[in-house]
């Protein structure tokens, strides 16, 4: 089921697209919480700290996977908006070829380097073996993660926001069930949690692929359309790699910061893990508004309607601000119950540190919303490389906090690292959007004169 976003109310279109994604993201965060809760409660604080200690490394790699998948979908969305279905099928076929290549390369490289990176980031000795087993298992599942992300991005590029949600719900329920089975029944520890995640991603990815094959006849390419094309691959890489690097570059700062936090001890790592999981429960769904704006901006760019893009940006900013304020208020009320899911009530100091992390992150959700909306819109307009520099700004900010301020201020510096990074990125992205907007206006005006 496709959806044309070049006609109709931007508010209704963005909400109709974003709300199912938000629900899916909330459910995904719920099963991520469940995953962490089960590990923390039934495996132990060390296992909780181990899973948390590789959070930055996990995002470094899987963020790249998600980024290239989203980037590959942008030319597909352009050609769909322009009603050029022949080119759309060519881009789809070459997306498949590139995905196979990246799946193999990323799996081999990450599995080989995992232990060395854990040592480099000062992972405490009492949790390094658990962390190694957990993240290495996740990396073995990269092909399935990429499959799910590519198929979901492809459906969203054509305006279908419901089907990816359905497959995500299936994966979420399956993941929770397998967590309970692997950890409580089979006593597989952190490896069981990682295995449950990989298996669930595999089911969702394969299911999405089968669904696309059966219900999207417009994507079935001919033999000629399915050939590997250097020009199409180059265009896809120009979109996908910068978006992937944007996530990875951002995560490099997180890895550096995590190394500094790891040096504060496993109790602090456990507090940061619990706090970040609780804070992300409501912050990550903001990405759904950004994802909606990528598709919205891409389709309207294909239709050469930049004024509609502006209306969409203003609408999305309003939605993001309302959501951010509501999320902050909810977390102020529910922070203790959320943290209590991960930790025993006797862990008083860890719980207090986790609450501090939640407060200092949630109070700055509005700049996070602004960052996400402008970043994804710029990507949808075809300037993924420019959006990547916002990731550089975030990386620099987090690395600065890790190198300089964590040694001086301790855990408080870790709590404010992400808000500092969000402000750094906003200072770059807001003027960048208006520069892109002016450039595209001139290009479209020149094209109309030539016609």
Go through the PLM ranges and name each one.
Residues 1-18, 76-141, 185-241, 297-364, ...:
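Short alpha-helical transmembrane segments in multi-pass integral membrane proteins
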Residues 5-42, 56-71, 75, 100-107, ...:
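N-terminal transmembrane alpha-helices
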Residues 16-35, 137, 148, 171, ...:
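Transmembrane helical elements of multi-pass membrane transporters/channels
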Residues 48-108, 145-164, 258, 271-335, ...:
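Small-residue-rich hydrophobic transmembrane alpha-helices
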Residues 60-63, 175-180, 205-209, 281-284, ...:
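Hydrophobic transmembrane alpha-helices of multi-pass small-molecule transporters
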């Amino acid at each position: 089921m496709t959806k044309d976003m070049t006609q109709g109310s931007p508010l209704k279109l963005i909400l109709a697209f974003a709300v199912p994604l938000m629900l899916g993201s909330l459910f995904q965060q719920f099963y991520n919480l469940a995953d962490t809760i089960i590990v923390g409660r039934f495996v132990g604080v060390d296992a909780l700290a181990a899973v948390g200690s590789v959070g930055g490394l996990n995002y470094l790699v899987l963020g790249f996977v998600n980024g290239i998948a989203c980037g590959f979908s942008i030319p597909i969305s352009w050609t769909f908006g322009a009603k050029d279905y022949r080119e759309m099928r060519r881009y789809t076929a070459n997306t498949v070829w590139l995905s196979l290549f990246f799946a193999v390369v990323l799996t081999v490289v990450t599995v080989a380097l995992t232990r060395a990176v854990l040592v480099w980031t000062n992972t405490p000795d009492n949790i390094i073996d658990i962390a190694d087993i957990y993240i290495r298992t996740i990396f073995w599942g990269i092909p399935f993660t990429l499959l799910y992300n590519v198929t979901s991005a492809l459906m969203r590029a054509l305006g279908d926001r419901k089907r990816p949600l359905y497959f995500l719900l299936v994966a979420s329920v399956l993941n929770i069930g397998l967590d309970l089975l692997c950890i409580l029944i089979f006593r597989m520890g952190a490896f069981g949690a990682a295995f449950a995640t990989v298996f669930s991603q595999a089911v969702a990815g394969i299911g999405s692929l089968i669904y696309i094959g059966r219900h999207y006849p417009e994507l079935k390419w001919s033999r000629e359309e399915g050939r590997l094309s250097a020009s199409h691959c180059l265009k896809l890489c120009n979109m996908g790699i910068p978006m992937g690097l944007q996530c990875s570059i951002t995560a490099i700062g997180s890895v550096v910061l995590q190394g500094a936090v790891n040096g504060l001890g496993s109790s602090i790592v456990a507090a940061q893990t619990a706090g970040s999981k609780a804070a992300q429960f409501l912050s990550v769904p903001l990405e759904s508004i950004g994802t909606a704006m990528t598709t919205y901006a891409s389709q309207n760019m294909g239709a050469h309607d930049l004024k509609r893009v502006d209306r969409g940006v203003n609408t999305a900013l309003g939605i993001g601000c309302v959501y951010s304020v509501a999320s902050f208020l909810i977390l102020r009320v529910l922070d203790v119950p959320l943290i209590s899911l991960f930790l025993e009530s006797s862990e008083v100091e860890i719980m207090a540190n986790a609450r501090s992390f939640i407060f200092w992150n949630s109070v700055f959700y509005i700049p996070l919303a602004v960052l996400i909306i402008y970043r994804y819109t710029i990507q949808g307009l075809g300037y993924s490389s420019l959006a990547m520099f916002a990731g550089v700004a975030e990386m620099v900010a987090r690395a600065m906090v890790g190198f300089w301020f964590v040694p001086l201020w301790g855990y408080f510096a870790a709590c404010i690292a992400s808000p500092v990074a969000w402000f750094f990125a906003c200072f770059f992205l807001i003027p960048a959007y208006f520069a892109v907007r002016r450039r595209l206006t001139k290009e479209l005006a020149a094209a109309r004169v030539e016609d």
